[in-house]
Amino acid sequence: MKRFIETIKNIFKIEELRKRIVYTFLLVLVYRFGCFVVLPGIDASMLAGLQQSTSEGLVGLLNMFSGGAFGNASIFALGVMPYISASIVIQLLGVFVPYFRKLQMEGESGRKKMNQMTRWLTIVIICIQGPAYMAAIHNQIPGAAFVAVNQLGWSNFWFNIVSTIILMAGSMFVMWLGERITDRGIGNGISLIIMIGIVARFPYAIVAEFGEKLSTNNGGLLLLIVELIVWFFIVAAAIALVQAVRRVPVQYAKRVIGNRQYGGVRQYIPLKINAAGVMPIIFAQALMLFPLLFSRWDATRGLAATMSNYTGFWYNFIFGRLVVIFTYFYTAVTVNPTMMAEDMKRNGGFIPGVKPGKKTVEYLDAIMSRVTLPGSIALAIISILPAIAMIFGINNSFASFYGGTSLLILVGVVLDTLQQVESYLLMRHYDGLMKTGRLSGRSGM
């Protein structure tokens, strides 16, 4: 404990790190304030229907990513989701389209071009999602809530246009906040904003669970203690999954330049057990919603009922299988053995016992296939843990922290942020946050 307190003191002794932490904290406060600012012309006291409809499914995921702003009809309702969607599209284009693949290999200049394209695509997605969100609002809340239409005499058309523009500006502002945090704050800004939205729900979830368990006289307190112990074990498992890597040794050839010798050292390529992050869970959740679109048809009503039973066997069985499939797919998209082999060859590196070129590509591909299997199974288990928690009587809000997207994002972003703080401490010759002085994070969401 004494060492931990000393480390916290050291963090604030470093002026640059202190400024970055304060800057990040202030921008996060701005974001959280905006999440509670309701769109002008809407009565905030009449949003119960919208909040209820955004509590589960993929829409619940969007509401979680926006920190509750989606269900509050906030000016930040769209949050960072348009930017994330655009980033995923550009990332996929980098695999399937030669032009984007070329940009990926151009280094910093190519990255800047792709970032600019991501911003423009974000605007296009916002232009689609903004009107769709306004249409959803009209369906979910009573007409009396639209004060601008009922009392100020605005037409629905102009109200929707103005509200869509405000949503666009809000989403772009959130994206700007994320970029500023990344550049001048601590951690990855976009990921940190999502994590803050998730963390904001935790106090409500834990208080609700405490209230339910302590109100029962048949061992409620004991059950609560068991739940918390199990939750800590699950968090530890999630940390292990995020940090787990398979290290592939790489030997670099010796080069003599003048009187100095370069290279000849052995390094490692860390291949992550879960290289896909949380994306397989998000894709699987989106796909599981498709049967609900046909719920009004008699022939498919039974299938829709099965797919809407989040604690049912078939829902979780299919959901888990989809997570495994999408883990393999997204890993194949994001991890490119061919590019890794070319980079190694270009820098004079090789894997001991493996010929450079095609054999290296095949070797890396085989390793990724082997390590992805346990990673995908572990990810599938974590993704269905919230449903299992609900079956055992845990409150829905608290159960969402037992696994799935919430837990993995929370763990991943915290590790990334701690890794940055760790690097600042070690550069100034202070003790790190961990005894080993090393912390592994994740590269992206």
Describe the function of each predicted region:
Residues M1-Q104, S109-M445:
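N-terminal cationic and glycine-rich segments that engage phosphates or anionic surfaces
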